[in-house]
Amino acid sequence: MKLGLITQVRDEIDIIRAFCSHADALFDRVYVVDHQSVDGTGKYLKSIIAGKPGWRYFFLDSKTKIQTAVGNFVMKQAFDDGVDALFFLDADEFLLAPSRKALEDSVKGLPGDECAGSITWKNCIREEFEPPVFSFNDPLWVPPLESKFAKLVVP
């Protein structure tokens, strides 16, 4: 099964390293759309994506809010590349999947190829906001309930 991820980012230097590591462990294809980052996010992404054949970087040189159109364009690219299931995450969103196999099993549990599925998550917050760069070792406040919102998964 080939899993893909689309993420749209802007000025995420504080969390992008952890997010890319997380994405690399779970996804075969990663499509990153950079919405004019000026904090070093774009430079970092270009440097790591150069060594990852399954990753693509897009720079959106426009100040308009066209996330839906961009997402649709990149989604077509992903399915043209043979992705079996496609996730949409922001750079500050991490899937609670103990392994790649567990994530694949979740996808296999979706209703079918003609119907999109969804996943839920918990909105965690760092207990301390220093240092400015996020690490998986940072203590987090984890709420008892999942968010009332869901993330889309397209098979």
PLM features: what roles do these ranges have?
Residues 28-36, 58-60:
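Short beta-strand/loop segment that forms part of the nucleotide-sugar
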Residues 68-72, 97-155:
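Catalytic-site signature of metal-activated, phosphate-bearing donor transferases
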Residues 2-21, 36:
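Active-site beta-to-alpha loop of glycosyltransferases that engages the nucleotide-sugar donor
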Residues 24:
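Gly/Ala-rich phosphate-binding loop of Rossmann-like dinucleotide-binding domains
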